[in-house]
């Protein structure tokens, strides 16, 4: 009887150890997959606009968004991707893959403002770009209309692992001090 108890106890301990190791392995694999999806901003710049939209959707999924769908076409009425944040709020995303030196214009922002909530029912409207800045008029409009404006610097933070929900309150800030152009 004692021998059976010892064998069962050892078996139970081995089973628990096995489950713990399998769980640790699973967590490690998830982390490695996330690292493999992280790109440098130079690599992001090399993406086509379609690949950029898919990559933004992947970042959303990484951060717990669900039901993320990419339209993948023009004529999407300003919604390049739609999904739901972890807390259930509907997220509508406009992606603009512009050259880093370009600014997002007020006209681009106006189009998104006009459709994000009225057409798509966004609870959170996110405008993400590879350019360094939004024009003053575009950023002002975004702030007045509660559009999250994610420029290149904030996108870089997101790419490097910052969680989307930590970036939302920054809304266009974090661009650094304005510098005079080199003479």
For each predicted feature, which ranges?
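Mixed-charge (Asp/Glu-Lys/Arg
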Residues: 1-77, 82-183
